[in-house]
């Protein structure tokens, strides 16, 4: 679900935390991708001309495999090394959110049943997309495909976003990639959004720098997490009537959820009501100390694709075109053989000229572009 209104709050208070660029700008990077989110996107977006999901002759859905295969190849062709992270068991606190999603799917099915004879294709499609969920079988199929492609994946013990952030924090990869803004609660150095969107959508990739985001908000990590809980997360309900502006204001004024609750409960005229038995502290702990496999225990290895294995699985078992799969496999093979080439910003640093004086405008002017490059220098992953 993500965190409601967080993107806009960061844009307002920390505009410098945002960057937009094209896929090619991630040249030479390793990225941990929320696989469950990707598969969900592929099941919604990868469709036939009539709006229906891709299927083979047996009627099996193959949209997720098509999306995973071709989007991964596009990244590898741009000299990016992806690693996919799959969800493990959901936290107990997430049960309420999962139940809400189930009810929404049931309601969507009722809407489809009521309009399927009289509704337009667009109306039916709108509700059909609400029925989409990633099955365990589809997860397993995606893992098998990745193995054949030579692309590593990680089975998270719990939340995939938390594991992506752990890999980024410990230097295994450059960034975590997910559409869920709550990924920022796990403190990845960088969050990438829109990474696996279709090229036809022409959506630039969004990069959010965590350190700049909380610096602009002037918050500590615990305060940032408390604000996200107030905004609304997957783990618990929020205080009714508290929107982004109010949530930010309350955290700035009181500093923590405990103080906010104390303020509301001690003010009889307050229009806000704290939910009964509100598990905000348990939610906070899930963000502060998530269940993850430590980065140093994870080994990531990109291997040469098994071309004939891909033909057997994707063509003979799943009904894809052999010419297209062979062509894609060759692109993948070439891209992975190239390896991650070093980025220029990983090799150069600026050294002041001997005898240069601080505040020397002439020297500063000459070094302007180099200084900017130095400030933007990032450790190569």
Curated annotation (Swiss-Prot):
InterPro entries the UniProt entry points to: 5-3_exonuclease_C_sf, Flap_endonuc, HhH2, PIN-like_dom_sf, XPG-I_dom, XPG/Rad2, XPG_CS, XPG_DNA_repair_N
Entry keyword set: DNA damage, DNA repair, DNA replication, Endonuclease, Exonuclease, Hydrolase, Magnesium, Metal-binding, Mitochondrion, Nuclease, Nucleus, Phosphoprotein
Region spans: Interaction with PCNA: 340-348
PTM summary: Phosphorylated. Phosphorylation upon DNA damage induces relocalization to the nuclear plasma.
EC category: hydrolase
GO CC list: mitochondrion; nucleolus; nucleoplasm
Protein residues bound to Mg(2+) 1: 34, 87, 159, 161
Family matches, as PROSITE patterns: XPG_1, XPG_2
Cofactor binding annotation: Binds 2 magnesium ions per subunit. They probably participate in the reaction catalyzed by the enzyme. May bind an additional third magnesium ion after substrate binding.
Coarse class of the protein's main subcellular location: nucleus
Required co-factors: Mg(2+)
Quaternary structure and interacting proteins, as annotated: Interacts with PCNA. Three molecules of FEN1 bind to one PCNA trimer with each molecule binding to one PCNA monomer. PCNA stimulates the nuclease activity without altering cleavage specificity.
Protein name (database record): Flap endonuclease 1
């Amino acid at each position: 679900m993500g965190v409601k209104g967080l993107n806009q709050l960061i844009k307002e208070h920390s505009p410098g935390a945002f960057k937009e660029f094209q896929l090619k700008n991630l040249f030479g990077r390793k990225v941990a991708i929320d696989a469950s989110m990707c598969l969900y996107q592929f099941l919604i977006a990868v469709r036939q001309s009539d709006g229906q999901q891709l299927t083979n002759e047996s009627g099996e859905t193959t949209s997720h495999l098509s999306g995973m295969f071709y989007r991964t190849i596009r990244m590898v062709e741009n000299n990016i090394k992806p690693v996919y992270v799959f969800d493990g068991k959901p936290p107990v606190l997430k049960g309420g959110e999962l139940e809400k999603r189930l009810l929404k799917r049931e309601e969507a099915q009722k809407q489809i049943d009521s309009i399927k004879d009289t509704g337009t294709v667009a109306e039916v499609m709108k509700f059909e997309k609400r029925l989409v969920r990633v099955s365990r079988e589809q997860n397993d199929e995606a893992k098998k495909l990745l193995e054949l492609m030579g692309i590593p994946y990680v089975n998270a013990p719990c939340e995939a976003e938390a594991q992506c952030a752990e890999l980024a924090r410990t230097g295994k990869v450059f960034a975590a990639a997910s559409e869920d803004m709550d990924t920022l609660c796990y403190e990845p150095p960088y969050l990438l959004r829109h990474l696996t969107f279709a090229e036809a959508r022409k959506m630039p990739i969004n990069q959010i720098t965590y350190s700049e985001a909380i610096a602009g908000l002037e918050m500590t990590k615990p305060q940032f997490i408390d604000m996200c809980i107030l905004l609304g997360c997957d783990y618990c309900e929020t205080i009714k009537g508290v929107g982004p502006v109010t949530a930010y204001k309350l955290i700035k004024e009181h500093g923590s959820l405990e103080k906010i609750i104390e303020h509301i409960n001690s003010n009889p005229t307050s229009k806000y009501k704290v939910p009964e038995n509100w598990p905000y502290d348990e939610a906070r702990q899930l963000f502060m100390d998530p269940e993850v496999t430590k980065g140093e225990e994870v080994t990531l290895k990109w291997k040469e694709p098994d071309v004939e294995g891909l033909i057997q699985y994707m063509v003979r078992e799943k009904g894809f075109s052999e010419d297209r799969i062979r062509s894609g496999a060759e692109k993948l093979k070439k891209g992975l053989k190239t390896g991650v080439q070093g980025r220029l910003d990983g090799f150069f640093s600026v050294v002041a000229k001997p005898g240069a004086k601080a505040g020397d405008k002439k020297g500063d002017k000459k070094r302007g572009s180099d200084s900017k490059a130095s400030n933007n220098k990032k450790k190569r992953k």
